[in-house]
Amino acid sequence: MDWIQTAGAGTQLPENNIKIAVFGIGGAGNNIIDDMLRMHPELQTANVQFFALNTDLQHLKTKRYVQNKAVIQFEESKGLGVGGDPQKGAVLAHHFLEQFHKLSDSFDFCILVAGFGKGTGTGATPVFSKFLSNKGVLNLSIVSYPAMCEGLKAREKAAKGLERLNQATDSFMLFRNDRCTDGIYQLANVAIVKTIKNIIELINLPLQQNIDFEDIRSFFKKPAQRLENEANLFRVTNTFTFSFDAHNTIEHFSHKLKNFEYEGFFDHKVEGAQKVILKVLVNQGLYPLDLTQIQEIIWAKIDNHNLEVQLGVDFTDANPSVQLFFLMEKKQAVSSDFIQKPAFISVKEVNQKPAKPFQVLNDLKELGLKYVKQQTGFNY
């Protein structure tokens, strides 16, 4: 056991060594993990490790920043991929379990990141998640769901994969590629990277009013015993962040949270959530915060009198901020109320009428060009 000396007290305390592993599974998962280490190399430490796993050796070799790489293969597969077949991905994952055990054995919390709709991520992620759950290792899956333009077949594969994943994982976050426009999926990667970074920091950076690892375990962990009517519910999580300054006031916070479903990449409404982790970083000299007012805004949005709240508070020299993690139980893996418009479109512009497939494709292209023009100033 590691010990730290307490100054002037002559006593020793055991050092907190929570170990976290982040596994990027399949092509999309590999891309996200590589992007994460490109943007935040400081996150990889002795206690936080990143892994890229893939059946496609050729793609795996293109990842420059992640150092821990492994090919999910078995004899005749030869690292050539699975041709978009989730069943083949699952079979190879089962053959890979002995190696996965060695990779994951020393970790307390595992985050699995994958794109659903093709072969490796869709097939292998539920296998690895179930293996971790059977060992009692806390695990969270962050997965993406295909956009309409990726085809109905991909969506069918993803939906079946989510059903298998829900039976295996403690909880999952679902990102919808529908929220991206004209195939600008790099925006999704950035959002997922930010989410993983926030989770790692929530665990590793102590607060004055702290949220300890057992608080986090109780938040994400699937109950050992569930009622019969709860057995098939999907345990999904969402996350929301907001930074305060002279131009981003408590009124703006309230507006953004009220319009959460229109301004985020993750699926599912948060009304009726059972649990919330609320992390507040305070700088009263820069922007005074009223915690009671913040909590009232959150409760009004969620509208659940039985809401469980884990509150963490600390001081910062930077802009004050709020981070929220929501946990809900839903009847569907993917919310039925499809929202076409991305975050840069105002709520008033959202068209609630169902669109024809070709209309959606044209809308996606138009909105993608509008976004690029807005971000770069370049006129097409």
From Swiss-Prot:
Pfam family, any one: Tubulin
Residues engaged in binding GTP: 27-31, 119-121, 150, 189
GO biological process: division septum assembly; FtsZ-dependent cytokinesis; protein polymerization
GO molecular function: GTP binding; GTPase activity
Domain of life: Bacteria
Record function comment: Essential cell division protein that forms a contractile ring structure (Z ring) at the future cell division site. The regulation of the ring assembly controls the timing and the location of cell division. One of the functions of the FtsZ ring is to recruit other cell division proteins to the septum to produce a new cell wall between the dividing cells. Binds GTP and shows GTPase activity.
Protein name stated in the entry: Cell division protein FtsZ
Organism whose genome encodes this protein: Mycoplasma pneumoniae (strain ATCC 29342 / M129 / Subtype 1) (Mycoplasmoides pneumoniae)
Source species taxonomy: Bacteria, Bacillati, Mycoplasmatota, Mycoplasmoidales, Mycoplasmoidaceae
